[in-house]
Swiss-Prot record:
It comes from Bacillus phage phi29. Belongs to the phi29likevirus gp16.5 family. Keywords: Early protein. This is Gene product 16.5. The gene is 16.5.
Length: 37
């Protein structure tokens, strides 16, 4: 994950939209195995 993607994720996390929050949780669950390496 590069800086630009990380910033996009931060912006996404800070969004008040509940739908985006659920999508973020889904994305996080999918990417956790990669982040644990």
């Amino acid at each position: 994950m590069n800086q630009k993607e990380f910033q996009a994720v931060l912006d996404w996390m800070l969004s008040p939209t509940i739908i985006q929050f659920h999508e973020y949780n889904y994305m996080l669950q999918k990417s956790l195995p990669f982040l644990r390496r």
